[in-house]
């Protein structure tokens, strides 16, 4: 199944979303594996009930394997727990997008609805109602996953599991440490994901702050909130909280959205600032102190301020505490607690594998974990030689103005191919629905109450390789519905689309996505790439 770890490989490293993915550019001759006679309790023992673990377990069972899946949620620093489904369903993608949607509604009501003829009196948001709606939907998904495992003939145990040796797992049912039981498995998959990190060197942070593990089930409205971090999680949380009407400040060490295209990152931040999110650049908390029902935050610039809520979103670490990996001498990156696994999901222990966020150098995205888990199961139990391809993986960030990306950033393309070999086509423009309400002021134009000086809300950007007939290696879009716009473009990039293919394609009018069919200005030309007139992303004549 797994090659000798000392064998030298020549992999092309493609960092699809600047999250350090691999590209398996060669077809490896894999050792075929068939389920042996039942010398183990199970053919496949999966630790972790997130997207990757569940997908791999069900795929293995579909090919005749006897599968056992463990899932147990250790409480957050504030005691928050949740059901099966992992981060994405419970404290990640799903609740995040629902709250983003709620915030987007609020922005439309407050900023745009009056101009479109709607009248609202005493518009007010109910945080508790939002949390109830979100959590009710999550519980329905938890239930569907349980029934899905059962119908797939995957045995499920709500137990805290750890490794005893390369084929033995011990566990504590429902986390009860008074009784330990063991099972054996021919293969073991670790798919425990990651958990948010709170720094040890900030006094009071672990005791008084929350993370994304807590915000989506917070019983009391967050009030005035400090978000610490520059990650996409930090910007998404601060964005929807601001849109819901809360006073939000973001404390940033240096740049936002490190690893993503920085022109797009700056545009996202600028839009958030225009909507009222405040940023403390280069300023971080040094100490948190409880003051009645508030939190006093002392900053690195010697200032201090009171907040109702402090949310840390500075990064995530692999959830491997208690797995007993050290006794097996498993290779782990100690700086982020991630398991070192190759492009085949193999660890340095032949019978143990790792997929999803807990694996080193893998994009932290649920669809990536699902695909990798399914492919691994097919290799183990179906004699497949399929290999996970980590190139051109799309992603979307659900900030107030969304950002979708696939492939290389402008900076990464310059680094890998040289600036002279890269051409960047781009255009800034205003979304049609927004520009109808928030028109930029002109001296001779008739004025009305909706005039507002706003920067161009949208950006369309293609990063191309000159020596390959301008093959597109990077797609970037800042604007509404970024995920929907980006998904189809990812397929085009995987099929090696070229700039001329975009030029020859007819756009759907009027949409923001059609802007990619009308990109003619390059960064190297030095010309303005701001659209002059038009209808959103398209031309009107």
UniProtKB/Swiss-Prot annotation:
GO molecular function: flavin adenine dinucleotide binding; glutathione-disulfide reductase (NADPH) activity; thioredoxin-disulfide reductase (NADPH) activity
Disulfide bridge map: 88-93, 535-540
Entry note: cofactor: Binds 1 FAD per subunit.
InterPro entries the record matches: FAD/NAD-bd_sf, FAD/NAD-binding_dom, FAD/NAD-linked_Rdtase_dimer_sf, GSHR/TRXR-like, Pyr_nuc-diS_OxRdtase, Pyr_nucl-diS_OxRdtase_dimer, Pyr_OxRdtase_I_AS, Thioredoxin/glutathione_Rdtase
Locations listed in the record: Cytoplasm
Cofactor(s), by name: FAD
EC number annotated for this UniProt entry: 1.8.1.9
Entry keywords, A to Z: Cytoplasm, Disulfide bond, FAD, Flavoprotein, NADP, Oxidoreductase, Redox-active center
A biological process term (GO) from this entry: cellular response to oxidative stress
Keyword Cytoplasm recorded: yes
A Pfam entry, by short name: Pyr_redox_2
GO cellular component labels: cytosol; mitochondrion
Residues the entry annotates as binding FAD: 51-52, 71-74, 87-88, 92-96, 161, 357, 364-366, 509
Reaction(s) catalysed (UniProt annotation): [thioredoxin]-dithiol + NADP(+) = [thioredoxin]-disulfide + NADPH + H(+)
Gene3D superfamilies assigned to the protein according to its UniProt record, in alphabetical order: FAD/NAD(P)-binding domain
Active site: 509 (proton acceptor)
Region (Loop important for the interaction with TRX1): 438-452
PANTHER family: GLUTATHIONE REDUCTASE
Family of this protein: Belongs to the class-I pyridine nucleotide-disulfide oxidoreductase family.
Subunit structure: Homodimer.
Protein role: Catalyzes the transfer of electrons from NADPH to thioredoxins TRX1, TRX2 and TRX3, which in turn act as reductants of disulfide containing proteins. Able to reduce nitroglutathione (GSNO), a compound involved in the transport of nitric oxide (NO); however, TRX1 is more efficient in reducing GSNO. Has no catalytic activity towards oxidized glutathione (GSSG).
Note: There are 2 isoforms resulting from alternative translation initiation. The displayed sequence is likely to represent the shorter isoform. In Plasmodium, the C-terminal redox center, which acts as the active site, is formed by two cysteines while in mammalian TRXR this redox center is composed of a cysteine-selenocysteine active site.
Protein name from the UniProt record: Thioredoxin reductase
Gene for this chain: TRXR
């Amino acid at each position: 199944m797994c090659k000798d770890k000392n064998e030298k490989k020549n992999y092309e490293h493609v960092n699809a979303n600047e999250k350090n993915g691999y590209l398996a550019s060669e077809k490896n001759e894999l050792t075929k594996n068939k389920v042996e006679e039942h010398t183990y309790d199970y053919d496949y023992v999966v630790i972790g009930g997130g997207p990757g673990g569940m997908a791999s377990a069900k795929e293995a069972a579909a090919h005749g394997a006897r599968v056992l899946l463990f899932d147990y949620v250790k409480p957050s620093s504030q005691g928050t727990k949740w059901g099966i489904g992992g981060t994405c369903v419970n404290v990640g993608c799903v609740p995040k997008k629902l709250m983003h949607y709620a915030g987007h509604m609020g922005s439309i009501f407050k900023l745009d609805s009056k101009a479109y003829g709607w009248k609202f009196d005493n518009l007010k948001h109910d945080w508790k109602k939002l949390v109830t709606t979100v959590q009710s939907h999550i519980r329905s998904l938890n239930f569907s996953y349980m029934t899905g495992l059962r119908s797939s003939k995957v045995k499920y145990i709500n137990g805290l599991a750890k490794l005893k040796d390369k084929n033995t797992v011990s566990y504590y049912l429902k986390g009860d440490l008074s009784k330990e039981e063991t099972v054996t498995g021919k293969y073991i998959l670790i798919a425990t994901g990651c958990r948010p990190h709170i720094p040890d060197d900030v006094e009071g942070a672990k005791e008084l702050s929350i993370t994304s593990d807590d915000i989506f089930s917070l019983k009391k409205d967050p009030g005035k909130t400090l978000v610490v971090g520059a990650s996409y999680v930090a910007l998404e949380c601060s964005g929807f909280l601001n849109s819901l009407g809360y006073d939000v400040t973001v404390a940033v060490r240096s740049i936002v959205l490190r690893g993503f295209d920085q022109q797009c990152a700056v545009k996202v931040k600028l839009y958030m600032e225009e909507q009222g999110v405040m940023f403390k650049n280069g300023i971080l908390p040094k100490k948190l102190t409880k003051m009645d029902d508030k939190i006093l935050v002392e900053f690195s610039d010697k200032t201090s301020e009171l907040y109702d809520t402090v949310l840390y979103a500075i990064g995530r670490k692999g959830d491997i505490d208690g797995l007993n990996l050290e006794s097996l001498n498993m290779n782990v990156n100690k700086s982020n607690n991630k398991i070192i696994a190759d492009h085949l999901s193999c660890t340095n222990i032949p019978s143990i594998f790792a997929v999803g966020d807990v694996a080193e150098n893998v994009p932290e995205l649920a669809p990536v974990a699902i695909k990798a888990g399914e492919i691994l199961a097919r290799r183990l139990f179906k004699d497949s030689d399929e290999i996970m391809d980590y190139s051109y993986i799309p992603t979307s960030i659900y900030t107030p103005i969304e950002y979708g990306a696939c492939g290389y950033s402008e900076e990464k393309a310059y680094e890998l191919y040289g600036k002279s070999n890269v051409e960047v086509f781009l255009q800034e423009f205003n979304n049609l629905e927004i520009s109808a309400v928030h028109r930029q002021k002109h001296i001779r134009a008739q004025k009305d109450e909706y005039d507002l000086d706003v920067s161009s809300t949208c950006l369309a950007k293609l990063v191309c390789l000159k020596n390959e007939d301008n093959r597109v290696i990077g797609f970037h879009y800042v604007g509404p519905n970024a995920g929907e716009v980006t998904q189809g473009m990812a397929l085009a990039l995987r099929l090696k689309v070229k700039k001329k293919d975009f030029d020859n394609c007819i756009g759907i009018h009027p949409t923001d996505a059609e802007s990619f069919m009308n990109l003619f200005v390059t960064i190297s030309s030095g010309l303005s790439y701001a659209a002059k007139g038009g209808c959103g992303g398209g031309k009107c004549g």
